[in-house]
């Protein structure tokens, strides 16, 4: 059950007239509360293009990296070779970034502002400035393709959902399928702020191995794994100092993991949060045209009201 609150950003299927000869994700999804990064640099500024809220909602599409499927799903694709979002990033992405300002450029994108949200464990003064308090992200999707080339600890990895903070990620949710397996694993990382402890890893289905720290691991195929093209759902909920991640599949019990964030540093003044969803390729060593791809059929973000 979702906690009560005010919905401030959501993507749900609804019917509107097509805006273009070729359907775009904005024809089926409400995208005014999101921006998009795609792995191309059409303006030659040395970074991946950022599609702002109004342009995205008006029917933006990219035939290579961001399209609407025949079944009405929002398709994200990111090859290994492509423009990156910053000099500090070495992986490509086709990924939405939550924007609570919904195109109001008088509101700053960064900082504790109406564009971002904070935890209910943050100071009350910060809650009053934010666009929302606490957050839940729900998605239904299928991962359609993962990389099959590159070093063994990077192959097959893709991030499908995140909470991002000022400089760190309270959660990065991964899907990962190895080339010789038919089914993949799901796991996540919780990254405390710098100076607040080491990164923590949680396996939900299968294993995260092989990893950078265990490159010789040869795990067996996860018995309850998720195949490419198989539809599943996830829920990421951050309430106060508690982070709860839930995986849902028809005919199977939910898989739930909870993390105590009380010592992770995200309740302090100045810390702001936002959701991200799509595909963030976690392979930089494979063939340039090798890629990750996922189709989202539902994506909904909710938040409590400011205090």
Swiss-Prot record:
Pfam families: Alginate_lyase2 (PF08787). Coiled coil: none annotated. It is found in: Secreted. One of its GO terms (cellular component) is extracellular region. The keyword Glycosyltransferase does not apply. Its main location: secreted. Residues 1-20 form the signal peptide. Its EC number is 4.2.2.3. It is an enzyme of class 4 (lyase). InterPro entries: Alginate_lyase_2, ConA-like_dom_sf. Keywords: Lyase, Secreted, Signal. The keyword Aminoacyl-tRNA synthetase does not apply. It catalyses: Eliminative cleavage of alginate to give oligosaccharides with 4-deoxy-alpha-L-erythro-hex-4-enuronosyl groups at their non-reducing ends and beta-D-mannuronate at their reducing end. One of its GO terms (molecular function) is poly(beta-D-mannuronate) lyase activity. Belongs to the polysaccharide lyase 7 family. Degrades alginates that contain guluronic acid. This is Alginate lyase. It comes from Klebsiella pneumoniae. The lineage of its organism: Bacteria, Pseudomonadati, Pseudomonadota, Gammaproteobacteria, Enterobacterales.
């Amino acid at each position: 059950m979702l906690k009560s609150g005010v919905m401030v950003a959501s993507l749900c299927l609804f019917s509107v007239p097509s805006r273009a000869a070729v359907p775009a994700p904005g024809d089926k999804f409400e995208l005014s509360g999101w921006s998009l990064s795609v792995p191309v640099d059409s303006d030659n500024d040395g970074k991946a293009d950022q599609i702002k809220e109004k342009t995205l909602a008006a029917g933006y599409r990219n035939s290579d990296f961001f399209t609407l499927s025949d079944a009405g799903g929002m398709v994200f694709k990111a090859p290994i070779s492509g423009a990156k979002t910053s000099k500090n990033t070495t992986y490509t992405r086709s990924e939405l970034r939550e924007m609570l300002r919904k195109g109001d450029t008088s509101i700053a994108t960064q900082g504790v502002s109406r564009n971002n949200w904070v935890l209910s464990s943050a100071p009350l003064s910060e809650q009053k400035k934010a666009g929302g308090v606490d957050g839940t992200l729900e998605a239904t999707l299928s991962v359609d393709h993962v990389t099959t080339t590159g070093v063994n600890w990077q192959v097959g990895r893709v991030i499908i959902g995140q909470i991002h903070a000022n400089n760190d990620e309270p959660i990065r949710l991964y899907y990962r399928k190895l080339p010789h397996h038919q089914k993949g694993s799901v796991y996540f990382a919780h990254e405390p702020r710098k100076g607040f402890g080491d990164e923590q890893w949680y396996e939900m289905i299968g294993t995260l191995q092989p990893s950078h720290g265990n490159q010789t691991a040869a795990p067996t195929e996860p018995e309850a794994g998720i195949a490419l093209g198989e539809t599943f759902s996830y829920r990421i909920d951050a309430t106060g100092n508690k982070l709860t991640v839930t995986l849902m599949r028809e005919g199977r019990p939910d898989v739930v993991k909870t993390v105590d964030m009380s010592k992770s540093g995200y309740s302090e003044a100045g810390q702001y949060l936002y959701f991200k969803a799509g595909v963030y390729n976690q392979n930089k060593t494979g063939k340039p045209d090798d890629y990750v791809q996922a189709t989202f059929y539902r994506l909904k973000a909710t938040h409590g009201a400011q205090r």
